[in-house]
Amino acid sequence: MNIIVGGGKYGCYAIEHLRQTGKAFIVVDTDIKCLAVKRFRLKMSPQASSDRESFVKGDLSTVLKLLESLKPEYVFPTAPVHIAADLARVKFNLEPHPDLINAILPKLPEVVVLQSGKGKLVASFNRDADCVEKCTMPKVCPSSRISKPCTMIELFRFACPDAFILISYSMAPGMGALKGKELLEFLSWVKTKEDFIVATACDCHGVLNAFKKRKTA
C-alpha cells in the first residue's frame, strides 16, 4: 500500500505512476471534490479499506494514523508541506527552534538558500528560476545552469550531520516519494530527542525544520 498526500495536480501524477506499476494506494485530502477524485473516480472510504484504490477525507492527523496502521511502502507528499516536520508536529508538542537553523546557515552556500527564518530553511540549486516540468535532475540544472558539486542530500549531511535526513526518492521525472519505513523510523527517533532538526531532500532541493519539545507543566 502507498499513501498519496494531496489530491491535486501532483497527486494525479502519483496516481498515474502507481497505476502503471500496479501498486495500491490511498489518496488523502481535505477536499472531497479534489482533482484526483474527479479525474479517477476514486471510491471514498471513511478509513483505510481493502480496496486497491481509495480516497480518505482527512488532514495530516489522518495521514499519521494511516502511516502508523498501514506501514506503507511509500508516501507521496504532493501537498505543499514538509510532511515529515508536520507529522512530527501533529504527534509531539513542538515549537520552532530558530537557533539550530541559524547555526547551519554559515555552512551552506548563499546561492542555494531560498528562504530562512522561524526555525525553517529551504534550499535549492535552482533558487531563482522555475523548475522544468518533470525534470530528470541532471547534474547541470536546466533552469539555473548551475553544475551541482554534490546532491542537496550530501550538502545537508555536511551542514547538519546530527539531523534526521529523509530522502525524497525519484519515482519518475518530477516525482519524489518518501519510504514509509523511514518516516516511521524518524517518528521513533523524535521520541528520544528534546530538540532536533529534520530535513527532506532530493538531488536538487531540500527543506530543514528545527524543533524543541515544549515543556509540560
Question: Language model features by range: what are they?
Answer:
Residues 1-19:
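Glycine-rich adenosine-cofactor-binding loop
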Residues 114-188:
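A conserved mid-domain beta-alpha-beta active-site/ligand-binding segment of alpha/beta enzyme cores
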Residues 20-24:
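Conserved S-adenosyl-L-methionine
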Residues 33-38:
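Short, charged/polar "capping" segments at the starts of alpha-helices
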Residues 182-217:
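Extended, charged low-complexity segments
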